[in-house]
């Protein structure tokens, strides 16, 4: 089981040290190494028809670890002067996808790179046109 709270502590703008550490700690044990664009793909099943997507960069202005407060099952940033956002939209998606993979739910799981700076990871993936793309009926994005 993955700790959502621990994952939310990472402030990870694209190409930052915190993003690299996040990917190494949380993504690579399940997904293996990323493609040349920084995207992670994991497939469960034979020609799955659903794709689940999120991304591993956040809109934080700085790289590092943020302090969080958990009160009455609500998570918030401890100090808004040291962090400009929680980063919960994409991080919750990554957390959910890791748990779905652990449960063996069939699908193509994609965690894109560089989404907060122009959707570069998803655009590159579509341009590469991997074979599994033609088998999909739908993509469910866990980003908002």
Language model region names:
Residues 1-6:
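N-terminal, Lys/Arg- and Ser/Thr-rich interaction peptides
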Residues 9-48:
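A non-catalytic alpha/beta surface segment that caps or lines the substrate-entry region
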Residues 41, 51-53, 110:
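Short, conserved beta-strand segments within well-ordered enzyme catalytic domains
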Residues 46-106, 126:
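Active-site metal-coordination/substrate-binding segment of hydrolases
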Residues 84-86, 90-144:
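Acidic/histidine-rich catalytic neighborhood of metal-dependent amide-processing enzymes
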């Amino acid at each position: 089981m993955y700790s959502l709270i621990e994952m939310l502590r990472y402030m990870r703008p694209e190409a930052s040290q915190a993003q690299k550490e996040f990917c190494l700690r949380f993504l690579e044990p399940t997904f293996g190494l990323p493609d040349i664009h920084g995207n992670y793909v994991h497939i469960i099943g034979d020609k799955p028809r659903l794709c689940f997507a999120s991304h591993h960069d956040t809109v934080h202005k700085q790289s590092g670890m943020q302090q969080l407060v958990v009160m009455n099952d609500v998570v918030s940033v401890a100090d808004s002067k040291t962090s400009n956002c929680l980063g919960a939209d994409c991080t919750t998606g990554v957390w959910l996808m890791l748990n779905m993979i652990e449960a063996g739910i069939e699908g193509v799981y994609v965690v894109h790179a560089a989404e907060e700076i122009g959707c570069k990871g998803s655009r590159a993936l579509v341009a590469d046109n991997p074979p599994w793309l033609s088998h999909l009926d739908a993509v469910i994005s866990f980003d908002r």
